[in-house]
């Protein structure tokens, strides 16, 4: 059974990099969003196993989307993707219910280990 992932980032390049890492590691990308509003809509529509979500995006940011997704589904598994130097935002995301975080630029093994951690596949 494939594990379904929703990728949320406003940069097309980041979505391409994540899709490549995920698909090469046996995960299935079931949707891609460019902002928080799209992320919420796709989460409700696709019900992915995990969301990989950027913090800083135009329109609704990742923290607000995380909060709304967790209100809709308290069991939602969200991993925050952040740039170096965003420690305060990472702490805020964890307090809002993010299960883990990964830092850009992505290391494929870190992406996979974060997914396995939140899915309890170790």
Pin down the residues of each PLM region.
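Two-component/phosphorelay signaling modules centered on CheY-like receiver
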Residues: 12-31
């Amino acid at each position: 059974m494939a594990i379904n992932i929703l990728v949320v980032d406003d940069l097309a390049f980041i979505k391409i990099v994540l899709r490549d890492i995920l698909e090469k590691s046996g995960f299935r990308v079931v949707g891609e969003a460019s902002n928080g509003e799209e992320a919420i809509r796709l989460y409700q529509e696709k019900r992915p196993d995990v969301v990989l979500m950027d913090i800083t995006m135009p329109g609704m940011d990742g923290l607000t989307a995380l909060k709304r997704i967790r209100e809709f589904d308290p069991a939602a598994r969200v991993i925050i993707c952040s740039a170096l130097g965003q420690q305060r935002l990472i702490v805020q995301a964890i307090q809002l219910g993010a299960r883990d975080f990964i830092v850009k630029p992505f290391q494929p093994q870190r992406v996979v280990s974060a997914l396995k951690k939140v899915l309890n596949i170790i």
